[in-house]
Amino acid sequence: MRALAVVVVATAFAVVAVRGEQCGSQAGGALCPNCLCCSQYGWCGSTSAYCGSGCQSQCSGSCGGGGPTPPSGGGGSGVASIVSRSLFDQMLLHRNDAACPAKNFYTYDAFVAAANAFPSFATTGDAATRKREVAAFLAQTSHETTGGWATAPDGPYSWGYCFKEENNGNVGSDYCVQSSQWPCAAGKKYYGRGPIQISYNYNYGPAGQAIGSNLLSNPDLVASDATVSFKTAFWFWMTPQSPKPSCHAVMTGQWTPNGNDQAAGRVPGYGVVTNIINGGVECGHGADSRVADRIGFYKRYCDMLGVSYGANLDCYNQRPFNS
């Protein structure tokens, strides 16, 4: 049941999810696979055109660095400077409950390793901005994977990350849409998996390309390798899909609404992130329990991080981006 929200919204960005740039500022701070250099234009390679002037990361041709240091506001230790291992366990209190199908899958080490592969995550802006971004990411993904209910022990918002597969993998559809660029592999299904419940071949393809894993051939990797699983969620979070900005840009104040956004009631704040993820289903028709659930997780995590919520938390009166 957890994958339904992303599955529905996936069709809204089928065309735009195949953005060409692979790395750097053009791809939300993503690093190139296999230690390749990231050129000033956001492409991966190993020649001087990629590793020379303007190179953004891994410019020595090794994963040890050599390029400009990504923006950082927390001593260079990224998300680990905001969420400790013990706090992670408190935030996702029941993720390893015996009743949760994903028990013992989503580890702190996998979370940190995946986040560090997207060096702009949790390192952009002042301390409050960085904390709010982390709270927003964990809130949205907690909603997508929640096992909670209204009267659940410790409250409904302590049951995030209970699921890792849509309907525990018991799905009828293969979620394959004909595509020459992202062809489906024989016998594979592309249903919702991981923290963001990534769905469909046209999302598995570019996500896998960005993180250096062939997810078209092996989509099950998203449900068997926790680091890969988290990376698909960070890819979605960091990657703009026109006309939508990236969730990262919204939560770090880098997104400015244009005229169409303003006319549609889309204003900076956590509510736009919900609109990006599942606006076609949840936004623009007044109060919605799913939006409220996303807000509930967000407020809990902000409280635990000691940061204010910011403005415009819901999308009740925002038109979806693709409407």
UniProtKB/Swiss-Prot annotation:
Q: Highest lineage ranks of the organism?
A: Eukaryota, Viridiplantae, Streptophyta, Embryophyta, Tracheophyta
- A single BP term in Gene Ontology: cell wall macromolecule catabolic process
Designated name of the protein:
Chitinase 1
Which catalytic reaction applies to this protein?
Answer: Random endo-hydrolysis of N-acetyl-beta-D-glucosaminide (1->4)-beta-linkages in chitin and chitodextrins
Location of the Chitin-binding type-1 domain:
21-61
| Homology family | Belongs to the glycosyl hydrolase 19 family. Chitinase class I subfamily.
Explain the purpose of this protein. Hydrolyzes chitin and may play a role in defense against fungal pathogens containing chitin.
Native source organism of the sequence = Oryza sativa subsp. japonica (Rice)
Q: What conditions trigger expression of this protein?
A: By fungal elicitor and wounding.
Which UniProt keywords are listed? Carbohydrate metabolism, Chitin degradation, Chitin-binding, Disulfide bond, Glycosidase, Hydrolase, Plant defense, Polysaccharide degradation, Signal
EC number assigned by the record: 3.2.1.14
Q: Where is the signal peptide?
A: 1-20
Return the PROSITE patterns for the record.
Answer: CHIT_BIND_I_1 (PS00026), CHIT_BIND_I_2 (PS50941), CHITINASE_19_1 (PS00773), CHITINASE_19_2 (PS00774)
Q: Which Gene3D superfamilies match?
A: 1.10.530.10, Endochitinase, domain 2 (3.30.20.10), Endochitinase-like (3.30.60.10)
What is the annotated tissue distribution of the protein whose record heads this document? Answer: Expressed in roots, leaves, sheaths and meristems.
Named from the GO MF annotations, one term is: chitin binding
